[in-house]
């Protein structure tokens, strides 16, 4: 299907200037979320470069990575803020599809690394009551994720301790067996030493 592109009302330099003003970090939705979390006592890192996709907000203590997404740029389905421009539609469809694909890949990669990924959409923060309610839900999600992380760490720690005990028991059985064999069949010390090397 061929799309009809309408002429841009701005000159190329004006359009370039407008596009350059669009921020990739420290956006209004991000700042709202950060203020809300900070007011509730959460401490976090911003734009963590060591993680895939540089999540907007990272809470290492809770194992949570938060993506604060603009509805337009990340293609929030069913959202009025995500309406596509009527000009150059093919370009915008492809761009937003690539953004959504990148978001999915980043989320999968972070989850594979053991992080809980929470996405907060721009439209969820519109309006004072709605925004506060979403930030409160976000705080609850973070606490739940932290509890899951602590539980998983405790399980890993206990399984490592159990594996360590099993190894010690195996070494004890092996030493007892060697002692029994040495009692039944005396082997000179130098030969035993050479066989272990």
Task: Identify the meaning behind each predicted range.
Residues 2-119, 124-197:
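Nucleic-acid endo/exonuclease domains
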């Amino acid at each position: 299907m061929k799309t009809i592109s309408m002429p841009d009302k701005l000159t190329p330099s004006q359009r370039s200037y407008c596009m350059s003003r669009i921020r990739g970090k420290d956006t209004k939705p991000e700042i709202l979320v950060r203020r809300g979390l900070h007011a509730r006592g959460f401490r976090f890192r911003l734009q963590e470069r060591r993680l895939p996709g540089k999540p907007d907000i990272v809470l290492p203590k809770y194992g949570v990575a938060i993506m604060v997404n603009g509805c337009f740029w990340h293609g929030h389905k069913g959202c009025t803020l995500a309406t596509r421009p009527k000009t150059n539609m093919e370009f915008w469809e492809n761009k937003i599809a690539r953004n959504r694909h990148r978001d999915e890949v980043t989320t999968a990669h972070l989850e594979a690394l053991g992080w809980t990924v929470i996405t907060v959409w721009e439209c969820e923060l519109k309006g004072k009551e709605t925004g506060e309610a979403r930030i409160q839900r976000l705080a609850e999600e973070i606490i739940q994720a932290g509890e899951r992380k602590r539980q998983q760490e405790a399980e890993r720690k206990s399984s490592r301790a159990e594996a360590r005990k099993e190894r010690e028991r195996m070494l004890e059985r092996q030493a007892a067996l060697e002692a029994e064999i040495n009692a039944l069949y005396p082997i000179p010390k130098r030969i035993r030493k050479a066989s272990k090397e």
